């Protein structure tokens, strides 16, 4: 309902939108330096990101440059930036991230989740018979499920390729940096909530997360424990 309110009432768009293809957390990104473990290590670091993440990482002391994707590699080559994030192992490798940096830090709260949206012209959709509307809705759900599974397969395969074929070292972002990101969000969120609609969105998200993630954390067994059991020594975190 909040999404409908945003697109139709606030933005005045003649559309019906549906979310789909929930994507995992974006990596913290690519760094020339292999030793990025503390908040002090990123102070003043020239770093490419965009959107709300730019505000977040500026709050943490990084020198943020909001560059389009096509300018990332040239900017790294010229020393305009020292590090960058883009999206995921597949998208990153497609544009040659591995050619300008060899240290890839996974795990970050700068964009912990995202999803695609399917937009239909509202007049067109509502003019269709109920069965045809249902076909489109189920097609979105099917595409969402398929893309989620395909992405997990491709991202993991491309990450492995980056390590074995391109000499990339994969790191897990340190708890110190992750905790600092959360503190920075706690500073930024009250400013975002000054907008009444955004405040209702945040309240809805918090209510959902409090309930669903509680269940997930209580019910899901420790994946790292199982991974270490069956693949001892594979993780280097």
Predicted regions and their residues:
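A gly/proline- and charged-residue-enriched helix-loop-helix capping module
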Residues: 1-8
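N-terminal secretory/targeting leader peptides
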Residues: 8-237
């Amino acid at each position: 309902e909040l999404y409908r309110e945003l697109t139709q009432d606030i933005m005045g768009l003649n559309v019906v939108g549906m979310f789909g293809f929930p994507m995992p957390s974006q990596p913290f990104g690519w760094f020339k330096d292999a030793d990025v473990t503390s908040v002090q290590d990123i102070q003043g670091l020239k770093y490419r990101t965009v959107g709300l993440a730019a505000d977040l990482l500026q709050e943490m002391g990084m020198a943020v440059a909001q560059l389009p994707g096509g300018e990332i590699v040239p900017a790294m080559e010229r020393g305009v930036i020292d590090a960058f994030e883009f999206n995921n192992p597949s998208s990153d490798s497609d544009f040659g991230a591995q050619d300008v940096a060899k240290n890839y830090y996974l795990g970050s709260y700068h964009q912990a989740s995202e999803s695609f949206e399917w937009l239909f012209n509202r007049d067109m959709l509502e003019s269709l018979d109920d069965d045809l509307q249902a076909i489109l809705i189920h097609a979105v759900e099917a595409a969402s499920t398929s893309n989620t599974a395909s992405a997990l397969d491709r991202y993991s395969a491309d990450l492995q390729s980056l390590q074995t074929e391109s000499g990339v070292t994969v790191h897990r972002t340190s708890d110190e940096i992750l905790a600092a990101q959360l503190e920075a969000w706690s500073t930024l969120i009250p400013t975002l909530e000054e907008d009444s609609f955004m405040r209702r969105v945040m309240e809805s998200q918090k209510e959902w997360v409090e309930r669903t993630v509680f269940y997930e954390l209580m019910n899901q067994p420790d994946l790292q424990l199982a991974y270490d059991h069956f693949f001892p020594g594979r993780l280097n975190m």
